[in-house]
């Protein structure tokens, strides 16, 4: 389940409403979101795990730095990876590799960031799988 929310000036909300997906959050999803906000223990655990796994994935990207990758510092539940503009290791190539291996990330070419991938922080298994797949891509492309 994925829940999102925004607090903004009315013109910004109107702009967001024009580009959002066609389906709003279900009533069940809304109830689950409200209940999760009341569970401080769970929120703290998720926050700690997200910070820990983000640091792990950033470290894995740093270890691949000799291939020209750079993790953009983040305080979010994702990291932004910048790839070289050209050469054997690119964002487009990594995106295709990850998709071919069942991993969906966000290739940001449409947002005018063709050298970048946005990768969400998931579970420990998911995060380690992404790190291993990126390492395999870089090692195979070099």
Predicted features and spans:
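Residues that form or flank phosphate/diphosphate-binding pockets in enzymes
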Residues: 24, 41, 89, 114, ...
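Conserved PLP-binding catalytic core of the aspartate aminotransferase-like
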Residues: 50-51, 55, 64-101, 117, ...
């Amino acid at each position: 389940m994925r829940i999102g929310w925004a607090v903004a000036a009315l013109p910004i909300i109107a702009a967001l409403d024009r580009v959002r997906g066609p389906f709003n959050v279900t009533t069940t999803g809304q109830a689950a979101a409200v209940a999760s906000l009341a569970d401080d223990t769970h929120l703290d655990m998720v926050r700690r795990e997200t910070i820990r796994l983000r640091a792990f994935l950033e470290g894995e990207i740093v270890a691949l730095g000799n291939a020209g990758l750079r993790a953009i510092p983040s305080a979010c539940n994702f990291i932004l990876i910048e790839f070289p503009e050209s050469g054997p290791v690119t964002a487009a190539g990594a995106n295709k590799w990850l998709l071919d291996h069942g991993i969906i990330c966000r290739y940001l070419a449409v947002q005018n960031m063709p050298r970048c991938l946005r990768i969400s922080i998931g579970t420990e298994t998911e995060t380690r799988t992404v790190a291993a797949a990126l390492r395999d891509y870089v090692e195979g492309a070099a």
